[in-house]
């Protein structure tokens, strides 16, 4: 009885893994000078490559495509490109606008052509307990990470964890994750104490139930991450404050910095020079901003104080960070007032904050701000007010129903003896009035415009 060799098997190419082999000298001479003996390798089929390399397979065509293109644009580079596009549109340079838009659409530095591939990779986003938006990492279940009930692999994993990774897991995890972990540990401990002499079948049943619960947790986390990603993406799409948003009212912008911009309000404000300082990057509160963005916002404040001081006027800066979970785009409102009113403003706000919300609160009602970012935890809703360049007050909002969104404007309107319609409802003003207010303040801002230095540095 003869047995057919493996080489003659019809399904041989689908089963056997073909490893790369060096080209022999006699074949290398026939192929040409571009093939070097013993260095150029012959690769197998796609299936054999996948079987041999697994998930780490790198194909030649992918390598060539990655070498031909540039590095992908970072978030900061995209923001800077959007700011340049806005400046070019304000100047009327259409050629530069088209060039920069092509570069932004391509998403690759040094490439002006948009990508030809229609496939799109989406990075899932999520919010941590401090309100920061992070890429959602693929969390594997315990059964995938440690094997099916393998306590030895679990111990090895815990040994390999250093302090930094443990701190990272602690920070990126949410309160709900910790509660679910605590509940599962209680259930597990109760099952262990149930019988001292458990049989092999009981242990197998427990491991089977654990595997089912792990799969259930994995599906639940995937659904939650997709839902949260869609909610965050929706807040980005609907935002009218982001510098690259199509809904941004560009005619209201006074000047654009590196990470922030100054604009007049689109509603009928408390004054014709009622302004807002807005970060170009989407962020729900100023305490989540980077150091350089925070410092840049201080530059706008110094310039505005100088402008209004020349008019013998004072100014009030306030921020209303409400519903941080909804991921709104934060901005600081700037309202000029008469010098006499500015001197009394701190007394009005101090009294109003002490009387707001209920009598019994978990947090201190009135916080005298020295460094706001170190005094209020991230992820909290709060109200903050500053008087000129001096420190002001802050208040942690515990009940949104008892703390109105018009808290600051109502106080300022009362000091200025303005009618209720000025602060009750912010109705969008006519575009002609918006443009008129913006053009008038541009003339006042020109002597202290620190963004001119940025333009001069970019032209050099």
Curated annotation (Swiss-Prot):
Polar residues bias: start-end ranges: 54-68
An annotated GO cellular component: post-mRNA release spliceosomal complex
Compositionally skewed regions (Basic and acidic residues) per UniProt: 113-131, 139-172, 205-227
GO biological process: mRNA splicing, via spliceosome
Pfam entry (one): CwfJ_C_1
Coiled-coil residue spans: 84-106, 210-231
Keyword Electron transport set for record: no
Region called Disordered, residue ranges: 38-78, 103-175, 193-227
Top-level taxonomic group: Eukaryota
The entry's keywords: Coiled coil
Family: Belongs to the CWF19 family.
Xref: PANTHER family: CWF19, CELL CYCLE CONTROL PROTEIN, CWF19-LIKE PROTEIN 2
The protein's name in its UniProt record: CWF19-like protein 2 homolog
Organism of provenance: Caenorhabditis elegans
